């Protein structure tokens, strides 16, 4: 199973383009083949990062991926190794050149341009502007009946999640005061440079003091221990369209756990769980109902009442209906997820064979069995010669 693109880049589902670009540049630098020669794992990670960035940096592809997963973007992201080292697949060249500059040109504390940026006029270096740590995504399972799935439903759910601390308004500080991190000086990053025969390499990591925020809290709030978040309970409304299937999921952006100290909230991911049904078996947007009918009713025909997802209806069993016949009731299936209309209901007709019979019923059946009109031979069936009998006729 392919990895989730958001997990590959280490960002939440509500991440904006700048966060995605920043995560991509860090990971592209970390796993670049030139920095990890003869390292197959690093090469595979590099391809994954580029593939994820190609999809998530494109608004249309990201929308399709959020709605349909990997199936929504097909093979386009993987066709050329994503946004590979030489810009294949639609990645932003300035991101790649900036990563090369970090590796081969830019010093540990320098902010000037160099390397590929000098050669190709690369974009301006980013500056750190911390807005708190991204809250984590929250995943819940929502059980739905087939009737709810058939028509769509709105659910009101109570969920437990991390919410902003009321005592400090989510700042983590009693007074709301913060100061620049003395370790990274507000950048949120620490760099370690090393020189090799191939040039200078720079390893970039999140600052361990501030956790990558660039600022640290003064006068920590005693209610949340300076985190700015506490466990709480909220009510959310989830609108589920008709036609969803088991393990489909809906993403509610910004409805997940709140981020520490004013950080953006993660997403709420609602995974659909379809309850087993008492009567129906689902087949795509169609449903199948098994109906047991007595032998006389199969032969003579009858009208019966059958359940549907819209309530019970009357249907006709035509005379001489054979066992395992599928009778169709149009438009009584499940609403289509995409487009209008609904699937159908199929009624599988089975013959009912009683286990216990009275003496009278047995005599009636014995008399019926003697009637030549109900035997297979009378209707041209059951008299086919076997292969060996046919061979005997030919050989003589």
UniProtKB/Swiss-Prot annotation:
Keyword GTP-binding assigned to the entry: answer is: no
Q: Which residues form a coiled coil?
A: none
Q: What does this protein do?
A: Participates actively in the response to hyperosmotic and heat shock by preventing the aggregation of stress-denatured proteins and by disaggregating proteins, also in an autonomous, DnaK-independent fashion. Unfolded proteins bind initially to DnaJ; upon interaction with the DnaJ-bound protein, DnaK hydrolyzes its bound ATP, resulting in the formation of a stable complex. GrpE releases ADP from DnaK; ATP binding to DnaK triggers the release of the substrate protein, thus completing the reaction cycle.
Q: What is known of its domains?
A: The J domain is necessary and sufficient to stimulate DnaK ATPase activity. Zinc center 1 plays an important role in the autonomous, DnaK-independent chaperone activity of DnaJ. Zinc center 2 is essential for interaction with DnaK and for DnaJ activity.
For biological process, the GO terms are: chaperone cofactor-dependent protein refolding; DNA replication; protein refolding; response to heat
Subunit relationships: Homodimer.
CR-type zinc fingers: which residues? 152-233
Per the UniProt entry, what species is this protein from, by scientific name?
Answer: Chlorobium phaeovibrioides (strain DSM 265 / 1930)
Q: Which Pfam families match?
A: DnaJ, DnaJ_C, DnaJ_CXXCXGXG
Q: What is this protein called?
A: Chaperone protein DnaJ
CXXCXGXG motif repeat windows? 165-172, 181-188, 207-214, 221-228
Q: Kindly list the cofactors needed.
A: Zn(2+)
């Amino acid at each position: 199973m392919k990895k989730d693109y958001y997990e590959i880049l280490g960002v939440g589902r509500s991440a904006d383009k700048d966060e995605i670009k920043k995560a991509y540049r860090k990971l592209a630098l970390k796993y670049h083949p030139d920095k990890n020669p003869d390292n197959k794992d690093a090469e595979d990670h590099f391809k994954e990062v580029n593939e994820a960035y190609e999809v998530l940096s494109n608004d249309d592809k990201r929308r399709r991926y959020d709605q349909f997963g990997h199936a929504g973007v097909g093979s386009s992201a993987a066709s050329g190794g994503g946004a590979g080292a030489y810009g294949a697949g639609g990645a932003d060249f300035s991101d790649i050149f900036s990563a090369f500059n970090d590796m081969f040109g830019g010093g540990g504390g320098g902010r000037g341009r160099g390397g590929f940026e000098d050669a190709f006029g690369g974009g301006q270096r980013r500056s750190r502007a911390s807005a708190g740590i991204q809250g984590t995504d929250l995943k819940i399972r929502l059980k739905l009946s087939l009737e709810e799935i058939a028509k769509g439903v709105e659910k009101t759910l109570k969920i437990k999640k991390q919410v902003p601390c009321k005592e400090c308004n989510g700042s983590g500080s009693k007074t709301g005061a913060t100061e620049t991190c003395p370790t990274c000086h507000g950048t949120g990053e620490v760099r370690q440079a090393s020189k090799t025969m191939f040039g200078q390499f720079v390893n970039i990591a999140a600052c361990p003091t501030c956790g990558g925020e660039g600022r640290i809290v003064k006068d920590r709030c005693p209610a949340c221990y300076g985190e700015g978040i506490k466990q709480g309970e909220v009510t959310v409304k989830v609108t589920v369209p008709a036609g969803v299937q088991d393990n489909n999921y809906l993403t509610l952006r910004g409805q997940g756990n709140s981020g520490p100290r004013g950080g953006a909230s993660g997403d709420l991911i609602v995974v659909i769980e379809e309850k087993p049904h008492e009567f129906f078996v689902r087949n795509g947007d169609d449903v199948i109902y098994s109906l047991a009918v007595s032998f006389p009713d199969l032969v003579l025909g009858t009208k019966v009442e059958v359940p549907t997802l819209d309530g019970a209806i009357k249907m006709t069993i035509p005379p001489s209906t054979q066992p395992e016949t599928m009778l169709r009731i149009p438009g009584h299936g499940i609403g289509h997820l995409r487009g209008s209309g609904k699937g159908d209901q199929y009624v599988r007709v089975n013959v009912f064979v009683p286990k216990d019979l009275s003496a009278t019923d047995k005599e009636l059946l014995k008399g019926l069995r003697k009637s030549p009109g109900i035997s297979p031979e009378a209707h041209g069936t059951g008299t086919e010669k076997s292969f060996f009998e046919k061979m005997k006729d030919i050989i003589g």
